[in-house]
């Protein structure tokens, strides 16, 4: 096991022990599937309405589709967001025959192909660049429809220095409205990732989505440190709550992010989609890593209460 893997497993175990030590936690409940190698404490848990999924960025960036499906089935990850440029090869250049093949492979498995993760962004001061990204988003919506996906993830990626922030927020919102029309026409959704220097601040995402004002455009919660204010994400969550259609999570051992509060807030809005694990580093033991992650997710999500 490499050093990154060792650190993750140690921190994960310690985080689990710390949770057990919290006052008011009752013992009992079912054992966690495929997690016998991890000393996760049993607790009074209930099944959340949402599911655990995987973003191929970056844990699965070097996996083909068969490997993605196999590893997710083995470890209980129920959905996938395929990030562009990765080995799976699912891109807008895919032929009609290849699209049908990808769709069938997921349909024949226990893993849902939920969304496509793009790098489409709309903040450039160059109108031609913005239009090119809008057109590319339209093509991603067509691919998502052909593959049976729910959504296409797009992102803001910071503020250009030469333009006022308000003008950029307006521009992004207007571009999202155009993308929303394409998503509606293809029976999918646009998910704006809470992303980018400055643009990731929840009030700025709120502004973009307010300007877009489109029923086919929502937010992808991204579990950023900038969500947290005074140890809580409630204020940020309330700002974006009406738009949350997807959710990225990352290292559940991180103590500087209130994971249980996030799960509780998701339960409170009856979120019934996917929390996608977005892991920044590949692992030399991916199945073991995913088993540990699933165990921590089960414990954290199951113990949360609305």
Where are these predicted regions, by residue range?
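Flexible loop residues that form catalytic
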Residues: 85, 121, 157, 252, ...
């Amino acid at each position: 096991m490499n050093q990154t893997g060792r650190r993750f497993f140690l921190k994960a175990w310690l985080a689990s022990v710390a949770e057990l030590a919290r006052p008011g936690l009752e013992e009992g409940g079912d054992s966690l599937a495929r997690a016998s190698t991890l000393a996760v404490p049993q607790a009074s848990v209930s099944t959340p309405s949402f599911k655990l999924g995987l973003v191929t960025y970056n844990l699965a960036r070097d996996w083909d589709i068969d490997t993605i499906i196999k590893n997710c089935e083995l470890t209980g990850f129920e959905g996938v967001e395929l990030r562009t440029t990765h080995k799976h090869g699912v891109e807008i250049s895919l032929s009609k025959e290849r699209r049908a093949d990808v769709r069938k492979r997921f349909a024949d498995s226990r893993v849902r192909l939920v969304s496509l993760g793009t790098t489409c962004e709309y903040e450039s001061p160059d109108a031609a660049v913005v239009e090119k990204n809008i057109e590319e988003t339209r093509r991603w919506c067509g691919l998502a429809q052909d593959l049976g996906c729910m959504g296409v993830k797009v992102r803001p990626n910071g503020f250009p220095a030469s333009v006022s922030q308000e003008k950029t927020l307006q521009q992004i919102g207007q571009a999202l409205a155009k993308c929303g029309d394409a998503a509606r026409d293809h029976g999918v959704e646009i998910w704006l990732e809470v992303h980018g220097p400055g643009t990731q601040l929840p009030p700025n995402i709120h502004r973009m989505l307010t300007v877009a004002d489109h029923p086919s455009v929502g937010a992808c919660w991204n579990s950023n440190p900038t969500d947290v204010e005074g140890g809580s994400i409630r204020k940020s969550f309330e700002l974006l709550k009406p738009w949350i259609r997807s959710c990225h999570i990352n290292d559940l051992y991180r103590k500087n992010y209130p994971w249980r509060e996030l799960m509780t807030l998701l339960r409170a809005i009856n979120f019934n989609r996917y929390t996608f694990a977005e892991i920044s580093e590949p692992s030399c033991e991916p199945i073991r890593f995913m088993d540990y992650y699933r165990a921590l997710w089960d414990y954290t999500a199951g113990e949360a209460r609305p």
